[in-house]
């Protein structure tokens, strides 16, 4: 009789323990901040007490987004998805990733996880040596609007990394239909150079290597701020800087709060166009652009030009500006591959 009572007690305790262990959590339980970005504004990573699963929140992941929030829940240790959760679900760490932007590749490379990439968009334009070395085994799924979903499905991805331009990616609905989880990466929207790089921490979380990602990122602000201080202590003066070339009859000038304007300031320069304090580039006419260029000490990011002769051919009127005459014209295309892929738009995100 005592043995039967003891057995019944053991069974009851076992059932009670199992019930507590498997009790479904609620999404509001995931309020423990695991990583709060210091420089980026578009994401955070949260957990819950006693849970190994995490919740990644991505805010306003495309231009013009207002109060848009997306979520990725990463299930770990056999835990359940919270009741009523309507976001994306990744079961375990991502081992097979399709990266739709070259910056995603650079971030995964920076944390030592580039070999998780099994699919890309536009492989010919990618600079990363590991991707090019494995190009025969990596699927090029094409570009948004013309995605090869049959190939994408055959890659058996755990996760697809997306980006939005002026709205949600057109891939969303098809990926949901195929039951392939996705996550938006909004690095390009960050105005801080360090904020862009900090998105590598998000990618380290989806691969189960957040500690590694935090360590890799931590070295970047140290190096960046040391260079910034060195420039600030310099007595070489503050050159005024003109940007870009015309697009049709307009010349687009970035905001003073933009990524490139901040790079200029941190490098000891003065961005010449101070009128645009908004959050997007604005067009000016060619006459105003000429007046700005005439006052500039340097001219950066001159489109497809590889030489002063190229620039002269595309902008003949601007050849009498001081920066042109002095040869103080610089482009960002020193590392361009044979297909025209520019590493500035790839690895520069993790090397500000």
Q: Model-found features: residue ranges?
A:
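Bacterial Sec-dependent N-terminal signal peptides
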Residues: 1-26
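Extracytoplasmic ligand-binding site segments that recognize negatively charged/polar headgroups
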Residues: 104, 120-128, 168-170, 186-202, ...
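Structured C-terminal subdomain patch of bacterial secreted/periplasmic proteins
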Residues: 190-215, 301-352
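Extracytoplasmic/secreted envelope proteins and their assembly/folding machinery
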Residues: 91-94, 102-108, 149, 169-172, ...
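Flexible, glycine-rich surface segments
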Residues: 229-316
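A short, structured surface patch at a secondary-structure boundary
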Residues: 54-57, 62-153, 159-165
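Soluble non-cytosolic domains of exported or imported proteins
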Residues: 142-147, 165-169, 190-197, 210-214, ...
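Bacterial Sec-exported substrate-binding components of ABC uptake systems
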Residues: 20-105, 212-241
């Amino acid at each position: 009789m005592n043995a039967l009572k003891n057995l019944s007690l053991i069974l009851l305790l076992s059932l009670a323990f199992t019930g507590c262990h498997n009790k479904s959590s609620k999404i509001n339980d995931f309020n423990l901040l695991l990583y709060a970005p210091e420089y980026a504004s578009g994401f955070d990573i949260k957990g819950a007490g006693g849970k190994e699963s995490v919740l990644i929140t991505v805010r306003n992941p495309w231009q013009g987004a207002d109060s848009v929030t997306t979520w990725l829940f990463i299930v770990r240790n056999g835990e359940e998805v919270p009741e009523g959760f309507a976001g994306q679900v990744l079961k375990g760490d991502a081992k097979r990733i399709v990266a739709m932007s070259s910056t995603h590749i650079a971030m995964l490379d920076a944390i030592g996880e580039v070999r998780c990439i099994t699919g890309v968009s536009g492989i010919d334009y990618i600079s990363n040596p590991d991707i090019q070395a494995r190009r025969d085994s990596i699927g090029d799924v094409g570009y948004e609007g013309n995605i090869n979903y049959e190939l994408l499905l055959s890659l058996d991805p755990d996760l697809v990394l997306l980006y939005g331009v002026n709205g949600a990616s057109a891939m969303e609905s098809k990926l949901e239909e195929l039951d392939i989880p996705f996550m938006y990466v909004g690095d390009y929207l960050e105005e801080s150079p360090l904020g862009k790089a900090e998105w590598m921490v998000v990618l380290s979380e989806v691969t189960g290597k957040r500690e590694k990602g935090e360590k890799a990122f931590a070295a970047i602000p140290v190096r960046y701020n040391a260079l910034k201080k060195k420039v600030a202590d310099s007595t070489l003066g503050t050159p005024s800087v003109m940007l870009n070339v015309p697009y049709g009859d307009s010349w687009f000038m970035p905001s003073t709060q933009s990524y490139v304007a901040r790079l200029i300031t941190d490098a000891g320069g003065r961005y010449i166009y101070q009128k645009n304090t908004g959050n997007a580039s604005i067009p000016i006419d060619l006459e105003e652009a000429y007046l700005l260029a005439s006052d500039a000490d340097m001219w950066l990011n001159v489109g497809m030009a590889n030489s002063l002769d190229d620039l002269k051919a595309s902008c003949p009127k601007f050849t009498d500006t001081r920066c042109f005459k002095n040869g103080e014209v610089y482009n960002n295309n020193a590392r361009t591959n044979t297909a025209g892929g520019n590493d500035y738009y790839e690895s520069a995100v993790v090397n500000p």
